[in-house]
Amino acid sequence: MFKITREEIEWGGRTLVLETGKIARQADGAVLATYGDTTVLATVVGERKPKPGLDFFPLTVNYQEKTYAAGKIPGGFFKREGRPSEKETLVSRLIDRPIRPLFIKGFKNETQVIATVVSHDMENDPDIVAMIAVSAALTISGLPFLGPIGAARVGYIGGEYKLNPMIDEMPESALDLVVAGTADAVMMVESEAKELSEDIMLGAVMFGHKEFQPVIDMIIRMAEKCAKEPRAIDVKDNSELVAKVRELAESDVRAAYGLKDKGQRHEALAAAKDKVKSALCNPEDPNAVSETDVGGVFKSIESDVVRNSILDTKSRIDGRDLETVRPIVSEVGVLPRTHGSALFTRGETQALVVATLGTGDDEQFIDALEGTYKENFLLHYNFPPFSVGETGRVGFTGRREVGHGKLAWRALRAVLPPKTEFPYTLRLVSEITESNGSSSMATVCGSSLAMMDAGVPLKRAVAGIAMGLILEGERFAVLSDILGDEDHLGDMDFKVAGTQEGVTSLQMDIKITGINERIMKQALAQAKGGRLHILGEMAKALDTARPEMGEYAPRIEVITVPTDKIREVIGTGGKVIREIVEKTGAKVDISDDGTIKVASSDGESIRKAIAWIQGIVAEPEVGKIYEGTVVKAVDFGAFVNFFGPRDGLVHISQMAPTRVEQVSDVVKEGDKVKVKLLGFDDRGKVRLSMKHVNQETGEEIVYENEPAEQPREKREGGGGRGRRRERD
């Protein structure tokens, strides 16, 4: 019934297995990939006919994690998986980026890739397994895919590169880098690093490229055994249309790209395109060329004009040379009531970034296959349509916004203070108010400034820069700080973020069939120069974190109490801690290890709450004098609250040096009194005395011929009937 094809290799100390022919046989390509005990099913389906009216390749990639893969049931009321998580969105992009450029040009058939995690061993991250499974499924599908690709994760532990480190090894690694590519070239890099040098980063990329070659060979062997026949793809011959459009528009396109202002340039290009459409398109003639076809050819002519101009003249659209960064203006403290804010402007790209400090209550709970954990550093990136002078949907967070936000998050995490020193939840929001290239790197720069403005003690400031590439045969040009048009018409988007000391994040996307080590080395070197320049410009606004947090930011103090005292601080049903919060106005967060965080924007509230807690957990000292309040009067004495929430008994015989007939003759409820702690009775109850303290001055009174009190250790319960008889 099944015609199974299986390939298996040892890779990175574990077994990698690819299998097809048993599951999802109606898909164009389906591969079950297993690494260790982590298994991903990848399926590929492409429509038989192209989708009309499109000038792009309609590829959709969906990565999904099923909770059953980790032996779990989803939370929530409906008990089934819901909308994609942040990780699912990010891995979907991770798979999409290296495969999209490898479909043949002109292929417009709607194509859907689905990668489903069906088993997770908690040791091997499914993202790499999913990328390999998708590559194999595409290679055997018969679709016009110029793969296969391989993928690998590279760590840097103890000064050495590590292939596919396990999940529990990653905290020790100074690097988390994912690289994908073909047998000949690198296609995609995504990474987070702890201020590593450019040489180490480049070495990691090349190490990963070398190490995934056996995976590519394995996929090729599988394809040789079971790949479907390649589909016949009908790609139009539009050479005649290209000639007509070039004749009508090339001079106008050259003139438009001579305009340095983005708005004027786009208006001129739109006018040139409209002229071509008016000349060549006729909606009433079914044989006339479509506006979509004209638009695609027009874009290719734009690309030729810009690319050849840059390669020939070494001058760019806005007149800069290849390495010059656009003018930068940095401002901090631009919003009066926020905890920290910055406005970072680079050319026509601008980010307004706001930092907000919170407490442990503000941490985000993340429910992952590996388990639920809390995240105290959040970064949200927003790209409203007005930033590029357009109208559009507002309030929806797309994949691009999630991806750009995570890139900036990775770039900044390496310089954050440890949680033990800075126990705040930190949320950054980047509002892109203008965009003409590299808004994610503007987010990095603005976020660094906003955090320093908020008083977050960063190790060092972080800046980011986006690099571009124009590659024609043996000729190439690496561009620093690319414009939006240079991104769209170029061959590479290479983003590097870091400090004066090294790289904290690197992301690379290639739109052609890959680049080599020589080009990457030049791009990294050029990016370093640009990054250091940007850091210098940022320092003009603020070069280090402010010594004090903003007026409206919460203050957090951390204290530690014995774990056996936690119950007393919380109280029955949370009664005590609720009372502390209500009466002091401070937030109190208690951890199981005895760490207590007390937070408030008012320093006095924090001091009161801490004093209250310390009063609960501290032990009063025998022989010391305390001030207290009478909380209850009874026939045999008075109960006095004297040490935080602690009460003790002043026996009627200890109220005055002379005989007291009625307790009410000496005290009543609410009176302030001074008491001496005599000790504890046999049941651990507190024994106090008023007669040994001058109620006016608070000084101790010592009586002659009175036997000295023998302090007893506090006892928990017990009898003592005989001892009581002796005292009597």
From Swiss-Prot:
Alphabetical list of SMART domains matching this protein: KH, S1
Keyword field contains Cytoplasm: yes
Subcellular location: Cytoplasm
Residues involved in Mg(2+) binding: 487, 493
Domain KH span(s) in chain numbering: 554-613
Compositionally biased region (Acidic residues): 697-707
Keyword RNA-binding assigned: yes
Cofactor: Mg(2+)
A GO term for molecular function: RNA binding
Pfam name, any one: S1
Keywords, comma-separated and alphabetical: Cytoplasm, Magnesium, Metal-binding, Nucleotidyltransferase, RNA-binding, Transferase
Gene Ontology terms: cellular component: cytosol
Top-level EC class as recorded in UniProt: transferase
Stated role: Involved in mRNA degradation. Catalyzes the phosphorolysis of single-stranded polyribonucleotides processively in the 3'- to 5'-direction.
Family indicated by similarity: Belongs to the polyribonucleotide nucleotidyltransferase family.
Protein name in the entry: Polyribonucleotide nucleotidyltransferase
Source organism: Parvibaculum lavamentivorans (strain DS-1 / DSM 13023 / NCIMB 13966)
GN (gene name): pnp
